[in-house]
């Protein structure tokens, strides 16, 4: 299961960087306005007709949505050009973030990072042992380094699975 979650996080990172959004604030607003409890037809009626990407995602102006055949949402992803433009500010450096281990609570991660992260992805998986909800949160420090962490909802607690460094030169 750990390998699947890390693979999922890395896949999300590739997808997010591959999908560029021109207006970060507008895109973030649309992303925040999408509820995982909505059905795809409800979103289309409320937010306008999305573009369908090659990967089967529905693009609502930079907020990407994946849905099951039933129309139930299985994920949403915030697309951006520069992660530092959308990530929450942090005083932490990667060395500190790297010290986090699997099992860290979201509260301890936020304390280390200096505040809540910016959600850039939410997934709801329904396949066997991998079933559950996952969130990817992002922070960026003054040096321009961006850090992301994947959390899984487990018994009411968010659990850290991975922290990934995105050097300033990459964004």
Task: State each model region's role.
Residues 79-95:
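Intrinsically disordered, low-complexity Ser/Thr-rich linker and spacer segments
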Residues 1-9:
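Bacterial N-terminal signal peptides that target proteins for export
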Residues 19-26:
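Sec-dependent signal peptide cleavage junction
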Residues 36-82, 102-171:
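A cross-family detector of function-defining hotspots
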Residues 28-33, 92-100, 136-138:
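Second-shell loop/turn segments in exported
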Residues 10-18:
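Bacterial N-terminal signal peptides
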């Amino acid at each position: 299961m750990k390998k699947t979650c890390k693979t999922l996080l890395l896949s999300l990172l590739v997808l997010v960087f591959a999908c560029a959004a021109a207006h970060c604030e507008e895109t973030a607003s649309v992303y925040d306005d999408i509820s995982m409890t909505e059905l795809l037809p409800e979103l289309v009626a409320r937010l306008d007709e999305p573009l369908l990407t090659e990967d089967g995602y529905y693009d609502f102006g930079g907020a990407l949505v994946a849905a099951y055949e039933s129309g139930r949402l299985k994920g949403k992803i915030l697309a951006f050009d520069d992660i530092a433009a959308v990530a929450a500010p942090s005083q932490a450096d990667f060395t500190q973030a790297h010290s986090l281990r699997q099992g860290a609570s979201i509260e301890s991660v936020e304390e280390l990072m200096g505040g809540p992260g910016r959600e850039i992805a939410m997934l709801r998986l329904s396949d066997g042992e991998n079933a559950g909800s996952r969130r990817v949160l992002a922070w960026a420090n003054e040096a321009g380094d961006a850090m992301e962490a994947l959390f899984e909802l487990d018994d009411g607690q968010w659990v850290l699975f991975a922290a990934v460094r995105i050097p300033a030169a990459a964004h």
